[in-house]
Amino acid sequence: TRETRRTPALRNKVYERLAEAQTLAEAKDYAGAAVILNDMISEDGKRALNSYELANVYNLHAFLSYAKEDYPQSLRYYEQVISQPDIPLAMEINTRFTIAQLYFVQEKWQQGIDALLMWFEMNEKPNAGAYVLLAQGYYQVKRYDLALDNVETAIAMHEGEGKLPKEQWYNLARFLYFDKEDFDSALDVLNTLIIYYPKKQYWVQASHLYGEKKDEPRQLALMEAAYEQGFLDRSSELVTMAYLYLNAE
């Protein structure tokens, strides 16, 4: 069950100053927006704000830093947002996801994974994109089994909803199957890629895998299909196809 929180109100005069800073930020006057926000959290100002108001000030500060591509500073402000007590649960959940993304942007993979796992614990309905993000994190730290589990989950979720998973999701799965020498699963993924994202590399690689499995008829059929689409532009590929024809006779 979801915890209930008693979030303090955002008072009108505070809201008006935040709106003023927001308007400046949208006009890309980041310095002007920062002046207002810094005044709000100066020694005197800070004492007058409740936790939810402070969280909103830090949240807008984080946005300003992000807009200037100062990711470490943006991260520090987002950490301040979630350190405020009794902020709305949705605000904390969204901020935790942003924190994870910011770690990944800075290639701090393990911290990103840890932040994302904390987000997963709080989120009742994680989406497929979050599982892919986690898979990419695990891939970067070479935890390939965990990467595969998560990208498989994402693909299954999307397919189950009648949506087409992204090409890069399939490619991550394909790489991970190859790495563990699960060539049957790699072939399944390649055959899916051929249907939805037909590119030369998928036809040629699938043909090669059928060759590894000593399934020459399929190996030849895929090379022929690639040839008919004008994909075979290297002489070595045409030689391979000629050999397959000779063996097939």
Outline where the language-model segments fall.
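Generic helix N-cap/helix-start motif at coil->alpha-helix transitions
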Residues: 10-19, 50-58, 88-98, 123-133, ...
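Structural motif corresponding to the intra-repeat A-B loop/turn of tetratricopeptide repeats
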Residues: 27, 68, 106, 141, ...
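Residue at a conserved register position within TPR or TPR-like alpha-solenoid repeats
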Residues: 24, 65, 103, 138, ...
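Solenoid-like repeat scaffolds
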Residues: 3-9, 41-50, 82-88, 117-125, ...
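TPR-repeat structural position
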Residues: 30, 71, 109, 144, ...
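N-terminal leader/linker segments that initiate helical-solenoid repeat arrays
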Residues: 1-79, 91-94
